[in-house]
């Protein structure tokens, strides 16, 4: 998942406001043949059918996951049933590094969006590879870092974009500007 910067302009009391927001979309992570050959030697491959929820909050991970092919969605569900997608990952991504490294259970739901093949690298192998293999260590650090940026953008959006501003951006993005009547509202 990467972030694209989107700017939306709108009028508020004759003042032109320019607000920014971040939208997320899924892209494959860069592939690394050396890393993939290394990963083939560790753990087991699992295939999940489309729409299969294979991790739920409270589960203890036995290893770190590497997506060989497919796409996974990682999300939380609030007490009111609201779903918040943290990220959607595709080929070449790791996930589960944080709870595995901290030896804590996951707090997320993980679901295959399409048929997905993953390699699960057991905790012991994960620790050894982090200590002894630079390619593996750098790939894990890059995965952590990209996810940290995603979280930073989420925090930035919540901290600096009030609910009022987010609603204005939503309405502006749905306004039909092809039909304008003087001193009237846009159709949505």
Regions found by a protein language model. Name each.
Residues 86-145, 149:
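Cyclic-nucleotide recognition modules
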Residues 2-50, 94-95, 99-100:
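Cyclic nucleotide-binding regulatory module and flanking cytosolic helices
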Residues 131-188:
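Polybasic "coupling" helices that flank or enter modular domains
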Residues 14, 28-32, 123, 137, ...:
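A structural signal for well-ordered alpha-helical scaffolds and beta->alpha junctions
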Residues 1-17, 35-36, 52-62, 88, ...:
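Short N-terminal helix-initiation segments at or just after the protein's N-terminus
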Residues 52-114:
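Cyclic nucleotide-binding regulatory domains
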């Amino acid at each position: 998942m990467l972030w694209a910067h989107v700017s939306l302009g709108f009028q508020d009391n004759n003042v032109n406001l320019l607000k920014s927001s971040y939208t997320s979309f899924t892209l494959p992570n860069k592939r690394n043949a050396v890393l993939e050959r290394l990963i083939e030697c560790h753990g087991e491959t699992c295939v999940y059918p489309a729409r299969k929820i294979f991790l739920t909050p409270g589960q203890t991970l036995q290893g770190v996951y590497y997506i060989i092919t497919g796409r996974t969605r990682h999300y939380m569900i609030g007490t009111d049933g609201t779903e918040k997608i943290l990220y959607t990952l595709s080929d070449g991504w790791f996930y589960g590094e944080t709870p595995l490294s901290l030896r804590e259970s996951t707090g997320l739901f993980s679901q295959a969006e399409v048929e997905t093949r993953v390699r699960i690298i057991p905790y012991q192998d994960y620790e050894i590879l982090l200590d002894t293999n630079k390619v593996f260590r750098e790939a894990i650090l890059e995965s952590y870092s990209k996810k940290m940026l995603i979280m930073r953008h989420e925090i930035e959006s919540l901290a600096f974009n009030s609910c009022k501003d987010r609603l204005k951006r939503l309405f502006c993005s749905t306004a039909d500007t092809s039909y304008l009547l003087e001193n009237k509202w846009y159709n949505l």
